[in-house]
Curated annotation (Swiss-Prot):
Single GO term (MF): serine-type endopeptidase inhibitor activity
Residues spanning the signal sequence: 1-22
Protein name: Venom peptide BmKAPI
Compartment(s) where it occurs, according to its Swiss-Prot or TrEMBL record: Secreted
Annotated InterPro entries: Ser_inhib-like_sf, TIL_dom
Amino acid sequence: MKFVFASFALFVIFLCFSQSLSQSYFRCRDNEVFDNCISNCGPPRCSNILNTYPCTNLGPLCTPGCKCKDGRVYDNQGRCVLQTECFQK
């Protein structure tokens, strides 16, 4: 029983440690947040938010990294802006 408990405790510690390492590896910019699973189809951008075609990327389903906060997309300069700002030019 002690072995099972010790194994479980080590597993939990490993999960916590690996999560903190992956978050510290990425330095997210203004209006970005870290996410463990970002779609490999690419982030939403001003240039593709109206695209109605589904992504057909056959690679891994997701990767860790930074993404725009809710309601924001990347503009042409790579900054996270509100979606409404995409159409103001």
